[in-house]
Amino acid sequence: VFCADLSRSIRCCKMHGGVPTEGFTEQFIISTVDAALYAQNVVIAAESAGLGICYIGAVRNDPAQVTALLNLPKNVYPVFGLCLGYPDQNPEPKPRLPISVILKENSYDSSEEDAQIKDYDEVVRTYYAMRSGNPKSQSWSEQMTGLLGKESRPHMRDYLSQQGFEMK
């Protein structure tokens, strides 16, 4: 489980007689990005060693239980889990969103994206239809509509506040 951790920095601040500030949005962003960057480096190393990986966002379904289980102090929260292992099969890799849709140079220009996303939707539909397990019929953009078209983990705001991430 990869955690955003401000408790260490707070202890360092106190160690030097400082008065730590808590709850600022920037601190939340920095600690979350740090956890994600660390995890991504673990993933790169694992995949280079032939391991398969799967990020597990479900640790945020009940973060209080995860916090208790892992004995996390205030100013620490679980961002996601990560499963590592040697695959017992060789599944076809899921096609990724084209880099031309993700990468922006010098300014944000999405004028060509709709056509590229529609093309990607067809690639994803074909992938889901052809894969051996858990076939789906939804396109990628339909999945995004499902994710953004509903409230997701509304308990996180209160949980984060209780952990010291108040978003000032």
Regions found by a protein language model. Give the residues of each.
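Acidic, surface-exposed loops and disordered segments
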Residues: V1-K168
